[in-house]
Amino acid sequence: MAHPPPPPNLTPLQSSDPRVIPPFAVHGRLGAGGMGVVYGAVGPDGRWAAVKVVRPEYAGEPEFRSRFASEVALMHRVRARCIAPVLAHDTRAELPWYATPYLPGPTLGARVRQGGALAPHQARVVAAGMAEAIAAIHAAGVVHRDLKPANVILAPDGPKVLDFGIARAADATALTRTGGLVGSPAWMSPERYRGTSGPEADVFAWGAMVAYTATGRPPFGDGGAETLMYRILREEPDLEGLPPELEEPVTRALDKDPASRPSAGELLHRVAAADPEAAAGADDTTIVDGLIRAHWAGGAVRGAPAPRTADD
């Protein structure tokens, strides 16, 4: 059986890598990270998938396995246009794994690093798509906990959010209980730094990522984890250059008080309502679909695919 062309960022398998993860035939690596390895594989339907396999040190933690199974089961039920769905999973395997479709396109982080800020209309698509995805995730009872530019793929048919819920499983392990903190410093909310987290933390990350998308720089700057923590806890974000229609929702999303932030559904509504081309009375999902068709058709945001990691 002829396989479709391989992903351009596929690298050769190592001697210890599996060649089959039923029902997927493994053809190479897409990337690796702290939590595991991402393999490029072909499913029974002939389509490419990204199969994310947990590292042994996590797989050996009973509490991690329990939470991982729970989170993946929830992820499998979430469906939204701007989410990469779970195709299959085996959380009882010696090394637990789950698979999502392989999505061609750069990550949001790679695209901004290579090309700078997105055009205002494209930034609005990313803002709306991420808000729609986060709202669907929260409606299913899941909190992403590690939203960052590496977890958003700018696919030809719109932005896609990856890997929601997995950071919660990692938080359960001895590897993090001994002092580590799961998350990415530039996108973490004040309460995450204080050791608590809920849906409001995802809203904060949305605000930081939309600002990054539209201005080309993180709203709390660059630097080490301690520097970023201080700025996020004590200083106001730099939102200079943010398009006017995104100023109000982003400012509210970045409020240091989680109780003062809007929900993801409210953010979606505000971004959708700001679309001057939206038909009167159209619902938010219809408006997002229209934004993607008008400003994203055929992969309007271009860039080379970046390596994927199991914790990106």
Task: Please place each PLM-identified region on the residue numbering.
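Eukaryotic protein kinase
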Residues: M1-G298
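Generic low-complexity segments that are intrinsically disordered, proline-rich and/or Lys/Arg-biased
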Residues: W296, A306-R308
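Hydrophobic single-pass membrane-targeting/anchoring helices
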Residues: A310-D312
